[in-house]
A protein has these predicted regions:
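Non-catalytic DNA-recognition/assembly elements of restriction-modification systems
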Residues: 425-498, 629-662
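Sequence-specific dsDNA recognition surfaces
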Residues: 483-497, 514-544
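A short beta-sheet element
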Residues: 542-594
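Long recognition/docking surfaces used for binding and targeting
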Residues: 43-139
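Specificity-determining recognition surfaces
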Residues: 444, 448-452, 467, 597-625
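A short glycine-rich beta-alpha junction/loop motif
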Residues: 371, 569-578, 607-634
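Conserved Class I SAM-dependent methyltransferase catalytic core
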Residues: 293-359, 364-373
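Conserved S-adenosyl-L-methionine
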Residues: 148-261, 266-270, 326-328, 338-339, ...
Length: 662
C-alpha cells in the first residue's frame, strides 16, 4: 500500500490540532485516565516513527477499512498490522518498552489515530513544527497526567541560563522526567551558538537522560526524536543504582560537563544495598564542627540527598551542576552534615531561593531553592565569593492553573517583548544578568541578589540567613547591648507529668488559642489525657511566656506569643510553643521584645523545614535580645504592665455588668 506524505507541514499549530484531536477522541471514548491517554498516544507516535524510519508503510488505514470501522464492523487487519508493528517497535526501543507492553486503546480509537497521522511524515516535516507541536501538546496534558515529573518551564530555563552550556559539552539529567532540562539546554545552544547548531549531532552525542519510569522516559525520548531523527541517549534506569553500571548503561564513563536535575522530593530509599554505596547513606558524626562518616548506614534517606552525591559523581572535575532541592536541605540542623559534604566536594557557585508557590500548579507547595555547584574534589581554594539570589515573580500565578502573569505598563497595558509577544512579569532574567555581572567580577547590588565570601558561610545555605538586611540587623545587635534569650530565661521543653495519667482531665492550649495582638491566651479546650493530640506537651504556669516555634506564622506579624495568667495556669500546651520561665530581665520588657521586628526577623531567618516551618531549640536560645538603657526598659515595661492591668480591669467591669443583670 503506497501513499504520499504531506511533507509541507510547517505550522506547528496544524500538527498540534491533530495531536489534540487524537488525545481528546481517545480520552472521550475509551475510558482511560488523562495519564493513560497520554501514555497510549506516545506509544502510537513511537510506532509511527519506527514505521517511517524503516520505510515499512504499515502505519496505514484504507478508506474502506476506516468506513467499515465507523459502521461498527471489526477490521482485524488493522489491529494485526499495528500489533505486529508494535512488536518490532518494542524491540527497537527495548530500553523504554517491556516485552509485555500492549496497545490499550480500542480498534475505533486506533483507526481514528492512524487516519489522522498516516499522511504526515514526522521524520521529514519541519523540525520546529513537530517539536513545538509536541511541546505545546505536552504542556496541555502533562500536569493532568503526571504532575510529579513536571518542572515549571521558567525554572528549567533559568537553571540552564545560569549554567550557560557550551557546544560539545556533555550534559545529563539523571532524573530527566519528560526531558525538560535537556530540551531547554538544546534550545539554549541553538540560540547562543555562532552559526547553525548541528541539532542531530548534539542530541546523539551530547544530551543524556535517565529516569526510572518507562512511560516518562518515553516522553523524553520522543521529544528528542522529534528534534533530531537519529540516536537519542534517554534510558530507563534507576540513576541511584551502582555507578559503574549506570555509566555502562549511559555509554559514557568519562564524566559530564553539566548535570541538570530536579530529583524526586521526599521519596524514601530504604534498601541497605543502595544506601551503603553512598557516603550520604551513612550517618555522620560531628566532632569539633567537622563531620566524619561513621560505619552506620541510615535505615532510610530521602532520594534527593542521594541524588546530590550521584550528580557530583557524574561530573568530571570542573564540571557544573544545577539541582532543585527542598529548602530543608539548605537549612535543617539535622542535615548540616549534608552541607558539610557539599563544601568538601564542590565549589558553591550560587544559591537561588524560589517562592513557595513555585510548584503549586504542579501539585506541591514545598518550598524549594536552586543549588549551583562546580565539582572541586581537591577543594584547595576556600576563598571565593558565593552568589545568592531570590526569585519573587515567576511569570505565572501560584494557583493550580499556573495562569501566566504579564508585565504591564503604568496604564495597565501588557508590555510586548522584542519578538512582539506579551512579556511575562518575572525576575528570572534579572537574576541571570546579576549572576553574569557577578561572574565578571562586578559588585552585586541588585534588589534580590548579593554575594558573601566562602569564609562567611556557616552551616546553612539559605538566602534569608545571609541577606544584607539580616546581616545589618546582627551588626547592629552586636554593636549594642544584647544577650541570648537562652541566657536570660529557662526554655522549658520537658513533657508534663500530667500526661502519664490517661484519664486525667486537662485544659489544652493550641497556637490558634492566642490573640497575637494582645499577647494573651483567649481559649483552651478540655480533654482527657488519652484524647489529647500527640503534640500536647508542656505544662504552663502563671507568669510564663509562651512563644511559637512551629507553623507558617513563625517570624511573621501573626507570630503567637502570650503571657500566661492564672486562668490558664496548669494547662497543657502544644509542642508548637516553647515555654519561657525564670526570667533574669523584666518579664514585660521581654514580652514586648518578643513581638518586635528585630525578634521576628531573627525567628523568620532561623525557620527551617520545607513543609512546616520550625525553629530549633538551639536557634531559639541563640536569638538576641536587645537591652536598651535601664530607663527605656522601665518605661516600656511600665506601659506594657499598665496595658495588661487596664485590659483586666475592663474585663472585670464587663463581668460586673453581667452580674447586675443576672
Amino acid at each position: 500500500m503506497n501513499f504520499l506524505f504531506d511533507t509541507q507541514l510547517t505550522k506547528e499549530d496544524n500538527l498540534l490540532k491533530k495531536f489534540e484531536e487524537i488525545h481528546d477522541y481517545i480520552y472521550a471514548n475509551d475510558g482511560l485516565s488523562p495519564q493513560q491517554t497520554l501514555e497510549e498516544f506516545v506509544k502510537i507516535l513511537f510506532i509511527k516513527i519506527y514505521d517511517e524510519n524503516d520505510n515499512l508503510n504499515q502505519f496505514t488505514i484504507s478508506s474502506e477499512e476506516w468506513n467499515e470501522l465507523k459502521s461498527g464492523k471489526l477490521v482485524h487487519a488493522i489491529s494485526e498490522r499495528i500489533t505486529a508493528l508494535f512488536e518490532q517497535t518494542k524491540k527497537a526501543y527495548r530500553d523504554i518498552f517491556d516485552a509485555d507492553d500492549r496497545i490499550r486503546i480500542s480498534a475505533m480509537a486506533l483507526g481514528f489515530t492512524i487516519n489522522k497521522l498516516q499522511n504526515i511524515s514526522l521524520l521529514n516535516s519541519s523540525q520546529d513544527a513537530k517539536g513545538l507541536a509536541f511541546q505545546k501538546f505536552l504542556s496541555h496534558h502533562e500536569k493532568d497526567g503526571r504532575g510529579q515529573f513536571f518542572t515549571p518551564e521558567p525554572v528549567i530555563d533559568f537553571c540552564v541560563a545560569m549554567m550557560q552550556p557550551k557546544p560539545n559539552e556533555m550534559i545529563i539529567d539523571p532524573a530527566c522526567g519528560s526531558g525538560g532540562f535537556l530540551m531547554s539546554a538544546l534550545r539554549y545552544l541553538q540560540q547562543n551558538t555562532e552559526g547553525v547548531l548541528d541539532v542531530a549531532k548534539t542530541v546523539s552525542e551530547n544530551l543524556f537522560g535517565s529516569d526510572i519510569n518507562k512511560s516518562i522516559a518515553r516522553i523524553a525520548k520522543m521529544k528528542l526524536l522529534l528534534e533530531a531523527n537519529g540516536k537519542t541517549n534517554i534510558h530507563c534506569v534507576n540513576s541511584l543504582e551502582d555507578l559503574d553500571s549506570l555509566k555502562l548503561t549511559l555509554g559514557h564513563s568519562d564524566g559530564f560537563d553539566l548535570v541538570l536535575a530536579n530529583p524526586p522530593f521526599g521519596a524514601k530509599m530504604t534498601n541497605p544495598a543502595v544506601l551503603s554505596k553512598f557516603d550520604l547513606g551513612y550517618k555522620w558524626s560531628n566532632q569539633n564542627k567537622e563531620y566524619h562518616k561513621t560505619k552506620a548506614v541510615y535505615p532510610n534517606r530521602n532520594a534527593e540527598i542521594l541524588f546530590i552525591e550521584r550528580c557530583l559523581q557524574l561530573l568530571k572535575e570542573g564540571g557544573r551542576m544545577a539541582i532543585v532541592l527542598p529548602n530543608g536541605n539548605f537549612e535543617n540542623p539535622s542535615l548540616e552534615y549534608l552541607r558539610y559534604y557539599i563544601k568538601l566536594k564542590a565549589k558553591i557557585l550560587a544559591i537561588v531561593n524560589l517562592p513557595q508557590e513555585t510548584f503549586i500548579p504542579f501539585g506541591t507547595g514545598v518550598k524549594t531553592s536552586l543549588l549551583f555547584l562546580e565539582k572541586d574534589t581537591p577543594n584547595k581554594d576556600r576563598q571565593y565569593p558565593i552568589f545568592f539570589g531570590r526569585i519573587t515573580k515567576l511569570g505565572y500565578q501560584g494557583n493550580k492553573n499556573g495562569t501566566p502573569q504579564y508585565l504591564k505598563d503604568k496604564y495597565g497595558q501588557v508590555v510586548k517583548n522584542e519578538l512582539g509577544q506579551p512579556a511575562l512579569d518575572e525576575d528570572f532574567s534579572e537574576i541571570v544578568e546579576a549572576y553574569k555581572a557577578f561572574q565578571s567580577g562586578k559588585k552585586v547590588d541588585a534588589n534580590n541578589s548579593f554575594s558573601i565570601n566562602y569564609d562567611e558561610l556557616n552551616g546553612r545555605f539559605d538566602y534569608d540567613f545571609y541577606s544584607p538586611e539580616n546581616r545589618k540587623m546582627f551588626t547592629k545587635l552586636d554593636s549594642g547591648k544584647s544577650v541570648r534569650l537562652g541566657d536570660i530565661c529557662d526554655i522549658i521543653k520537658v513533657k508534663s507529668k500530667k500526661l502519664k495519667d490517661p484519664n486525667k482531665t486537662v485544659e489544652y492550649v493550641e497556637l490558634s488559642d492566642i490573640n497575637t495582638h494582645a499577647y494573651e491566651i483567649i481559649n483552651s479546650t478540655i480533654y482527657q489525657v488519652h484524647e489529647l493530640p500527640s503534640r500536647a506537651s508542656y505544662e504552663i504556669e502563671d507568669g510564663d511566656i509562651v512563644t511559637a516555634i512551629a507553623g507558617n506564622s513563625v517570624g511573621t506579624r501573626k507570630h503567637a506569643t502570650a503571657l500566661v495568667n492564672k486562668d490558664f495556669a496548669g494547662s497543657i500546651c502544644t509542642n508548637g510553643f516553647r515555654v519561657l520561665r525564670n526570667f533574669k530581665i523584666d518579664t514585660y520588657y521581654l514580652l514586648y521584645f518578643l513581638k518586635s521586628d528585630v525578634f521576628l526577623k531573627q525567628m523568620f531567618m532561623y525557620r527551617t523545614g520545607a513543609a512546616i516551618p520550625n525553629v530549633s531549640d538551639i536557634d531559639l536560645a541563640n536569638t538576641l535580645i536587645n537591652l536598651p538603657d535601664e530607663k527605656i526598659m522601665k518605661d516600656i515595661s511600665s506601659k506594657m504592665k499598665k496595658a495588661f492591668e487596664l485590659r483586666q480591669e475592663s474585663r472585670n467591669q464587663i463581668e460586673s455588668i453581667v452580674l447586675e443583670l443576672a
